[in-house]
Amino acid sequence: MEQVNSKRTYLAIDLKSFYASVECVKRGLDPLTARLVVADESRTEKTICLAVSPALKALGIYGRARLFEVYEKVPRGSFIIAKPAMADYLQVSSEIFAIYAAYVATEDIHVYSVDEAFLDITSYLRTYEMDAEQLARTIIKDVLGHTGITATAGLGSNLYLAKIAMDILAKHQTADLDGVRIASLDETSYRKLLWQHQPLTDFWRIGPGISKSLHNFGIYTMGDLARFSLTASEKLYRKFGVNAELIIDHAWGIEPTTIADIKSYRRKDHSISSGQVLATGLYFEKLRNILIEMADKLCHELHEKQLLTNNLTLHLSYDKKADSTSVKPFAHGSKSFSYTDESNLIIEYFLQLLAQILDPTRPVKKLSLTLGHLKPVDLITTQLDLFDNQKITERASRNQNLEQATLKIKQKYGKNAILRGTSYLEGSTMRERNQQIGGHRA
């Protein structure tokens, strides 16, 4: 286990019930007292609530509840249902980032999600002549003053401890009058305060699967895990592979990764994918149109990123309600081919795969498309058939010109500026999806 520099100070900030708070502020309501959920009720009462205000959480309704579960606990008409407005949330998030950047250089900020960020405030404590909690409270109060949104914060000697202080300690503290909670941890206090904490799933990066596997070793707390690692770490490596190092480090309160490390990391995209849960189960003809739209959108992403693919995968999940038989509930297939970015070719390959794997007597409720083995255009030399060199080259050139022209039109006028004819057929979802962010209306 590598020791980290304990002299650094990190601040983790989680904006409280962010989507719900934005909707409350838009309506002139107090985010801490208003009863509001963010959900698209047009998707039926089974739709998942993207956010729940603190006042409703106090009644036992938590984030990701389904709308009918809210109705079971709170009378209809006694709370507000706000339709998701993702563009608004992104706008407010960017405004809050600007507030962070007024205190800390952008290279010392890591945006973890739309409502959560990490700041390395080490070198700023002397600048502002504040201790860590004073600076944290100053930043959070500034966010509150400008946006009406409060936050929970954690301070730590590394990124992990800052997040755990926020996730576990701060969220169980009594809030101040503005709803702000701040907690702090270093390696020593972490072991003192949280080595006996249960359940393990409260800790960052430990989900139900890992927790169950640890239970099989007789490990129920981080203290158990730390002690187990002293004498039987090889068992953890056999079970979890390279991830064992991370969970062992975290058991001891160690996290060597810094914000600078995160900033310098460049992810290599090996695949891109698109999935969709359909409003109702569809059979071949209508499903075919949806697949064409989704494949076309993936190809658009290929062209934007200037990538080529030589492999695709299609996964179908059948509608359980319409088909309660015990036969396999899904279909799956893949296809390999020469590297290309030609939309027509890729769509045709997806259609061939659909015809191969689909049971035409069963409606499909979910589908997922993936393009794999991605490579940059300039790294791939197309292997052309000896006798068809000129013909294939000319076709590829024409298609590439068409793809680039289409891309420019969409970039300038929007994704719905130019569409395939299938996008205007009954049952098409592309026009609506093009106006969404993260699967929800912008």
Where are these regions (language model features)?
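Residues that scaffold, gate, or flank divalent-cation-dependent active/transport sites
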Residues: 1-114, 118, 249, 295
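Acidic, metal-coordinating catalytic segment for phosphate/diphosphate chemistry
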Residues: 22, 328-442
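Catalytic palm subdomain of template-directed nucleic-acid polymerases
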Residues: 119-140, 218
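DNA-contacting surface of Y-family translesion DNA polymerases
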Residues: 3, 12, 202, 212-363
